[in-house]
Amino acid sequence: MHGLLLAGLLALPSNVLGHPAEPPNSVNVTHRHIDTSAYFLPQLSLYNKSEDVAEYGGDNITGSSYSGGDHSASNLSSEDYVTVATSLLKATLPYASFRLIDDHYIGDSGIGHVHFRQTVYGIDIDNTDFNVNVGRDGKVFSYGSSFYEGEIPKANPVAKRDFSDPVNALIGAINTLNIPVTAAVGEVKTTPIEGNSTYMFKGTTGALTDPTAQLVYLQKDGGLHLTWRVETDVGDNWLLTYVDAKKNDQVHGVVDYVASAEYQVYPWGVNDPTDGERAHLYFPWFKTGSRNWHIDGRGWHTTTRGNNAIAQDNPSGGWEYEDNHRPTNPLLIFRYPYTQSMTPPASYRDASITQLFYTGNVYHDLLYILGFNEKAGNFQVNNWGKGGKGNDFTILNTQDGSGVNNANFATPPDGQPGRMRMYVWDTSTPYRDGSFEAGIVIHEYTHGVSNRLTGGPANSRCLSSLESGGMGEGWSDFFATVVHLKERDTRNKNYTIGEWASGRQGGIRKYPYSTDLHTNPLMYVDADGLESVHAIGTIWCTILNEVLWNLIERHGMGNVNKIKPTFKDGVPTDGRNLAMKLVLDGMALQPCLPNFVQARDAIIDADMNLTKGANRCELWKAFAKRGLGVGAAYNPEKRVGSSRVPGGC
């Protein structure tokens, strides 16, 4: 079993930074979310960017030779790039034992991505990852590592049976985190699954699926800790709890797959009901990204269900969705009334379901064209033989009764469905439905993207430290901002998140996203002392907003009324789509549990691969403006800022 990430939209601005105070917090967030902030995994990753690899000769490790060329994935063979990656790992850490994770793929930018997990006595060290990016020339492009290099236990704990019963670990996790699952010694039975000391628990109540436990090591505080990785999915949280294998009241770390956010149809580019009018759209899917939104290779659906998503209301807030209400029309005509004055929300549920289904599908198709496809771990029932694991469309719940004034997205590994919950907001009269604010929907969906790309599709645990989790929130805000740019926008325009749904002028972040340092003064070093992923994410999105506008000013905005990007030689021709492409490619390049500096380097590497570094100076100037220039350094207590750019810029 694997971990899952639950990410959420909402963190209301508060006095978390040393800047002028906010207006009083007037939004009451209610949900059943478990606070795991005390159990972030440690930040351990190193990233060797492309210029470092070239300087120290790592790029001389190659597979069988072939000629370079365009961005086509056919330039690499699977045997070659996996062999190259394996050779690098063996050369870099010759004494480490490891296993190849079965999620390697060649992205549409031509880079092969390979991921490894370190093992000891055949037991995974769960937070050790080695990712290798192999270029189109068959050489190592860049790589990252969080492999453990300390002392190894002298004996195999499985042979000695030197650990507790997994039932005790389950109870320890439940008691420590107050997980709403009932399990009693004597009533819960364990069933071995998958080998490698993995068990399923029968006889519990409260979880969506039977909990599991796997014996793994966790790297922490300079040593290895033998733990039971207990997996419990209770809807608002889908947790991997690392319980000490001997002291079951001690928890070493927690991963939550669920990510919460703040947020006939409003067309793409219309952020909310104040931003434009509803329209009747016909056949809106891209054939490149979807054959049709209502087929999945198994049948034709005359409701809001298809290969990419299944959308329904969920007023009970429960876990089941198959039998929930969806609008149905044999001609696929989904026209339902909605105005902002309508109340209660249930009176316009069909309009809400249709809007959520539309927004989720369009975003799926756009991301597909930008590189988040089957091989990269996207969300589809049927992958049409193109790689990756299927059976994982996105479950889209609107008017979800499990909370208000928020939204969330659960991201399990590739092959298991993502789950989005959109809530009603009670901060205005009449209440507002978050599914009608596209920025919230896109924010949530992007949690699924960043978690699938970072560390590989099979590993949803790679944004589980404080800083990487914060960047997850920042990426989500960034994409939510980019997709509703208007033709006449300039870098002088400010952007907000959640303003319509919350009814709060200025939205739900501490500052609007602005390139004006007076309007938004956030710098890299402002992350010092922050304990909220949303506050950290606001800094990261602020930095990415500088990247966006530097690229737009060089390459233009493009046609904002055209959803599908235009490419030349595999590169988006406008700055808006180029920014999204580089950020997505950077996610796939960066190591598991990245920090700001590593993510910056990965974006610059993405440009080096895609354009041969044509935008190097635009990128460095953007990062440097917010203190993430040459010489900036990560330290969780005292980050080092820098406004320097490289020579030649």
From Swiss-Prot:
GO terms for biological process: proteolysis. GO terms for cellular component: extracellular region. The keyword DNA-binding does not apply. PROSITE patterns: ZINC_PROTEASE. It is an enzyme of class 3 (hydrolase). Residues 19-260 form a propeptide. Its EC number is 3.4.24.-. One of its GO terms (molecular function) is metalloendopeptidase activity. Glycans are attached at N494, N609. Zn(2+) binds at H443, H447. The active site is at E444. Its cofactor is Zn(2+). Pfam families: FTP (PF07504), Peptidase_M36 (PF02128). It is found in: Secreted. InterPro entries: FTP_domain, Fungal_virulence_M36, Peptidase_M36, Peptidase_M4/M1_CTD_sf. Its main location: secreted. Residues 1-18 form the signal peptide. Keywords: Glycoprotein, Hydrolase, Metal-binding, Metalloprotease, Protease, Secreted, Signal, Virulence, Zinc, Zymogen. Binds 1 zinc ion per subunit. SUPFAM superfamilies: Metalloproteases ('zincins'), catalytic domain. Belongs to the peptidase M36 family. Secreted metalloproteinase probably acting as a virulence factor. This is Extracellular metalloproteinase 4.
